[in-house]
């Protein structure tokens, strides 16, 4: 609070909107309309907290000042940019000046006493330069790129390892001067490439497109940590579950393509309490980050259902991965946090529960979240008419599998529950589920229970509704 009064923001003083948290914010709206002659008309406005346009003169000049203060710097894979830009390479003397500036900045970092040798720190910085060259080489000719390649370290793995150490070193308290040096290094590379000329008051917004391209997951982690150290605002687009696992879910925004628009979904303020956030972080972010790309979650109680459901769906000709359906067990994290999270992130969901007491409680939780709406319940809940998946599949014609695993002769009478208990004792619930799934694979689609076929159709309908 109070930073809106500093010198560089004075031209925007009529645009500030006071907010409840004590901060002043600028809300800038940019609209585009396609005219009949296919030209685009751009409309600019500054708005208040209610979304109403402020009455201002010289809006274009204010917008230019805002862009000058907050320029967007776009990082993307240099391979794609080379197809667009050609013949705009800085002259060789400029490259030599850049090399001297980089050398000065690296010596500046070395001058601070650390546990690393000078050579190690220089090698770590060399890896950082490689990373930035990877994204900013779009204006390089083939000859220039070969010259840059010759300068790179021969031992790249060692360079990346040292860079990881430098990351952790700079991230310690009191590392502000080092961050400034890195930012200077970053700005030097930007200007040397001729990509942008930054105003001295600029605080750039870094737009990073698919940083996982051509980077091994370990190197991606190191590079992402480096970018986190730069005192800049960042917007990153990615298709990488590895990268999502490095990012708090509160900072993730899902983009969903719909028939007429692209919708953006995020948790927002007050989205989850501390306990729910911890469970989601462990269950989804750390262990199933790629599930954030799914269109629909099929929530099941445990590992048994995961094995059986995936195999039976495949027997019916449904490829869940291609359809954007992810089977997720919820017993460890709790059902309510997962549904709450899925709703806020724009992910469709369906729950499969057992018929025992625990399953009935889970079903009651789902009905409560749906306000006991029968129509919505049909879309989001399937209850097994049996104690659990083992009892259900036994009744659906797979009793011979359980007898075989339990090693019970056909002529020995024994009730269903004891057979299943013995089979689990001789194997395990997951292994027994795999046996049933393999037998279902041998029998074909006719062996799949009708209840599960209907559930598959409902889940795919939910997923496809979010697909187009």
Positions of PLM-derived features:
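Glycine-rich phosphate-binding loops of NTPases
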Residues: 2-110, 367-374
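Conserved catalytic network of the ASCE P-loop NTPase/AAA+ motor domain
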Residues: 65-68, 192-201, 226-230, 290-292, ...
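The start of beta-strands in P-loop NTPase/AAA+ ATPase cores
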Residues: 71, 204-205, 296, 349
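Extended helical coiled-coil dimerization/tether regions that scaffold
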Residues: 90-205
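Switch/communication elements of ASCE P-loop NTPase nucleotide-binding domains
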Residues: 161-287, 364, 461
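RecA-like P-loop NTPase motor core
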Residues: 244-245, 250-358
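Activity-critical C-terminal alpha-helical subdomain
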Residues: 361-435
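Terminal low-complexity/disordered tails
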Residues: 432-468
């Amino acid at each position: 609070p109070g930073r809106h009064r500093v010198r560089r923001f004075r031209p925007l003083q009529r645009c500030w909107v006071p907010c409840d948290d004590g901060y002043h914010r600028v809300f800038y709206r940019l609209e585009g309309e396609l005219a009949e002659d296919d030209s685009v008309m751009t409309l600019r406005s500054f708005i208040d907290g209610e979304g109403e346009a402020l009455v201002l003169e010289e809006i274009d000049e204010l917008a230019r000042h805002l862009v000058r203060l907050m320029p967007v710097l776009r990082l993307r894979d240099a391979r794609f940019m080379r197809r667009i830009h050609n013949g705009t390479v800085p002259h060789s003397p400029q490259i030599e000046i850049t090399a001297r500036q980089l050398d000065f900045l690296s010596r500046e970092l070395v001058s601070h006493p650390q546990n690393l040798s000078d050579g190690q720190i220089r090698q770590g910085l060399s890896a950082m330069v490689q990373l930035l060259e990877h994204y900013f080489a779009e204006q390089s000719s083939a000859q220039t790129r070969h010259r840059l390649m010759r300068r790179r370290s021969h031992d790249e793995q060692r360079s990346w390892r040292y860079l990881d150490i430098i990351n952790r070193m700079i991230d310690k308290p009191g590392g502000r001067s080092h961050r400034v040096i890195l930012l200077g290094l970053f700005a030097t590379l930007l200007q040397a490439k001729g990509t942008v000329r930054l105003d001295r008051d600029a605080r750039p917004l870094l737009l990073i497109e698919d940083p996982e391209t051509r980077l091994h997951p370990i190197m991606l982690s190191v590079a992402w940590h480096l970018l986190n150290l730069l005192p800049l605002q960042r917007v990153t687009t990615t298709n990488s579950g590895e990268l999502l696992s490095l990012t708090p879910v509160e900072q993730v925004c899902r983009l969903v393509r719909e028939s007429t628009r692209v919708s953006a979904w995020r948790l927002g303020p007050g989205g989850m309490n501390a306990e729910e956030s911890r469970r989601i972080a462990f269950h989804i972010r750390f262990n199933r980050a790629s599930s954030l790309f799914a269109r629909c979650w099929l929530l099941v109680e445990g590992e048994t259902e995961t094995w059986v459901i995936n195999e039976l769906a495949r027997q019916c000709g449904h490829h869940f991965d291609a359809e954007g359906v992810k089977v997720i067990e919820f017993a460890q994290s709790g059902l309510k946090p997962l549904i709450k999270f899925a709703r806020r992130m724009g992910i469709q969901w369906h729950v499969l529960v057992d018929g025992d007491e625990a399953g009935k409680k889970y079903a009651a939780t789902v009905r409560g979240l749906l306000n006991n709406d029968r129509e919505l319940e049909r879309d989001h809940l399937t209850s097994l008419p049996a104690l659990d998946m083992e009892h259900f599949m036994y009744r659906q014609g797979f009793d011979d599998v359980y007898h075989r695993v339990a090693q019970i002769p056909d002529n020995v009478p024994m009730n269903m529950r004891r057979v299943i208990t013995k089979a689990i004792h001789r194997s395990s619930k997951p292994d027994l589920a795999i046996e049933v799934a393999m037998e279902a694979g041998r029998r074909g689609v006719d062996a799949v229970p009708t209840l599960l076929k209907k559930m598959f159709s409902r889940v795919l309908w939910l997923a496809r509704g979010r697909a187009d």
